[in-house]
């Protein structure tokens, strides 16, 4: 009788369904390539911005193109942040819709943990950043509180795919689910806290256009000659409203049907994810990561600024503490429990991995410090440095855990009698 309550305890990081794991496996392959391209683009931007030819980088980044009459005469870097990232957020919107309709987030009991972990992983780094800048007496920097709250799924999954050859699949699924919730919360933060001027006319027009787009796809319309112009008009109106234009991408993604006769979420995601991960996000990274460091002395000077060490502390300390502590508290004080095949060190490695912030963190940095170039550059340096440190710490922890699971796997696949069946699945001769 004493063991009975344990059967009702929900396992944290329990095994997902086979179709869900197949989908995640395909997603891992795409995001791994995207993460590699993201890294290459960021490194290329850093090298160019700190080379004798850095003026060329600035000229390309600041080159203005677009129709002035429509107030779309934007710099190349602004087109990358406002335009190309809308593709990324459209894919995020489709992924969110799918998770809430047929994925792990459709079950409130399963969704509670990643949602709570994501919230904890956003609150703690924000509190650390605010605390650091308050103590330093730089209240003018408080607008950057949201910079360290985001997790870059492409980078995180790329690191996990490289080092985690034998880690339990449930860890990867949990990271993906947490990152999806993280993206949703980051989108809400951008829409609510980084909208400076709101024009209700264009906003209403954008929402009506999105509704027409949604009605079309719900009715089975698939022709890009209709859907693409509607999406562009919705994006332009959202941009004119003062709300960040990428929010239009998310809302358009939410309208894509997941179930039913006209379901096309999987098909659209399959077609657009390579464009997002392979082009849109790397191009954004190229124009967002190019910051003139000024050598070791310049780097050391940047590290002395509260924006820099506030963001780094938020990513390297705040993110892991928030994710790990929330998960532990739920396991300790609710009916949730850690899966018997996992150790808390696995969760620690995952929590450290969540500290890799890049795409959304850089975007929030641009929005928070668009009128403060020095603070903006400090934020860029901090995001890059903090993400690298978090990735390295996660790699150390997860590599050690991967070695443990590799030894377990090797022991479980021993076939001493060469009969094609591992010995662990055969009865012992002395029984």
Curated annotation (Swiss-Prot):
<feature type="transmembrane region" description="Helical">
    <location>
        <begin position="379"/>
        <end position="399"/>
    </location>
</feature>
<keyword id="KW-0472">Membrane</keyword>
<feature type="transmembrane region" description="Helical">
    <location>
        <begin position="74"/>
        <end position="94"/>
    </location>
</feature>
<dbReference type="Pfam" id="PF06965">
    <property type="entry name" value="Na_H_antiport_1"/>
</dbReference>
<dbReference type="InterPro" id="IPR004670">
    <property type="entry name" value="NhaA"/>
</dbReference>
<keyword id="KW-0406">Ion transport</keyword>
<feature type="transmembrane region" description="Helical">
    <location>
        <begin position="347"/>
        <end position="367"/>
    </location>
</feature>
<feature type="transmembrane region" description="Helical">
    <location>
        <begin position="33"/>
        <end position="53"/>
    </location>
</feature>
<dbReference type="InterPro" id="IPR023171">
    <property type="entry name" value="Na/H_antiporter_dom_sf"/>
</dbReference>
<feature type="transmembrane region" description="Helical">
    <location>
        <begin position="311"/>
        <end position="331"/>
    </location>
</feature>
<keyword id="KW-1003">Cell membrane</keyword>
<dbReference type="GO" id="GO:0006885">
    <property type="term" value="P:regulation of pH"/>
</dbReference>
<feature type="transmembrane region" description="Helical">
    <location>
        <begin position="112"/>
        <end position="132"/>
    </location>
</feature>
<dbReference type="GO" id="GO:0005886">
    <property type="term" value="C:plasma membrane"/>
</dbReference>
<comment type="function">
    <text>Na(+)/H(+) antiporter that extrudes sodium in exchange for external protons.</text>
</comment>
<feature type="transmembrane region" description="Helical">
    <location>
        <begin position="173"/>
        <end position="193"/>
    </location>
</feature>
<keyword id="KW-0915">Sodium</keyword>
<keyword id="KW-0050">Antiport</keyword>
<feature type="transmembrane region" description="Helical">
    <location>
        <begin position="225"/>
        <end position="245"/>
    </location>
</feature>
<feature type="transmembrane region" description="Helical">
    <location>
        <begin position="144"/>
        <end position="164"/>
    </location>
</feature>
<keyword id="KW-0739">Sodium transport</keyword>
<feature type="transmembrane region" description="Helical">
    <location>
        <begin position="279"/>
        <end position="299"/>
    </location>
</feature>
<keyword id="KW-0813">Transport</keyword>
<keyword id="KW-0812">Transmembrane</keyword>
<keyword id="KW-1133">Transmembrane helix</keyword>
<protein>
    <recommendedName>
        <fullName>Na(+)/H(+) antiporter NhaA</fullName>
    </recommendedName>
</protein>
<dbReference type="GO" id="GO:0015385">
    <property type="term" value="F:sodium:proton antiporter activity"/>
</dbReference>
<feature type="transmembrane region" description="Helical">
    <location>
        <begin position="197"/>
        <end position="217"/>
    </location>
</feature>
<comment type="similarity">
    <text>Belongs to the NhaA Na(+)/H(+) (TC 2.A.33) antiporter family.</text>
</comment>
């Amino acid at each position: 009788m004493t063991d009975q309550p344990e059967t009702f305890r929900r396992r944290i990081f329990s095994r997902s369904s086979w179709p869900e794991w197949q989908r995640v496996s395909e997603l891992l392959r795409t995001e791994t390539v995207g993460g590699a391209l993201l890294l290459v683009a960021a490194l290329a931007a850093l090298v160019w911005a700190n080379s004798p030819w850095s003026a060329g980088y600035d000229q390309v980044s600041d080159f203005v193109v677009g129709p002035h009459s429509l107030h779309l005469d934007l710099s190349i870097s602004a087109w990358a942040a406002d335009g190309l990232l809308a593709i990324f957020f459209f894919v995020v919107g489709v992924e969110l819709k799918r998770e809430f309709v047929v994925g792990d987030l459709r079950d409130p009991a399963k969704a509670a943990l990643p949602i709570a972990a994501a919230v904890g992983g956003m609150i703690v780094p924000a509190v650390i950043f605010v605390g650091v800048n308050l103590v330093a007496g730089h209240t003018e920097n408080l607008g950057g509180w949201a910079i360290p709250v985001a997790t870059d799924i492409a980078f995180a999954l790329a690191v996990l795919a490289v080092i985690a050859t034998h880690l339990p699949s449930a860890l990867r699924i949990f990271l993906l689910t947490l990152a999806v919730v993280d993206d949703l919360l980051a989108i809400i933060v951008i829409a609510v806290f980084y909208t400076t001027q709101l024009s209700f006319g264009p906003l209403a027009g954008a929402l009506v256009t999105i509704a027409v787009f949604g009605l079309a796809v719900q009715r089975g319309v698939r022709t890009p000659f209709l859907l693409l112009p509607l999406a562009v008009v919705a994006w332009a109106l959202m941009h004119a409203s003062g709300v960040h234009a990428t929010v239009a991408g998310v809302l358009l993604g939410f309208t894509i049907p997941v179930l039913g006769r006209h379901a096309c979420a999987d098909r659209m995601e399959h077609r657009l994810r390579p464009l997002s991960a392979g082009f849109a996000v790397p191009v954004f990274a190229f124009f967002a990561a190019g910051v003139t460091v000024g050598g070791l002395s310049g780097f050391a000077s940047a590290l002395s600024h509260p924006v820099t060490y506030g963001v780094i502390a938020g990513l390297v300390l705040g993110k892991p503490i928030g994710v790990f502590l929330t998960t532990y508290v739920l396991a300790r004080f609710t009916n949730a429990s850690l899966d018997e095949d996992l150790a808390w060190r696995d969760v620690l490695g995952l929590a450290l991995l969540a500290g890799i912030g890049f795409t959304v963190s850089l975007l929030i940095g641009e929005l928070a410090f668009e009128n403060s170039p020095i603070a903006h550059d400090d934020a860029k340096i901090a995001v890059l440095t903090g993400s690298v440190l978090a990735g390295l710490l996660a790699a150390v922890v997860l590599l050690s855990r991967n070695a443990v699971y590799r030894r377990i796997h090797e022991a479980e696949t021993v076939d001493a009698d060469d009969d094609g069946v591992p010995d662990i699945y055969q009865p012992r001769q002395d029984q």
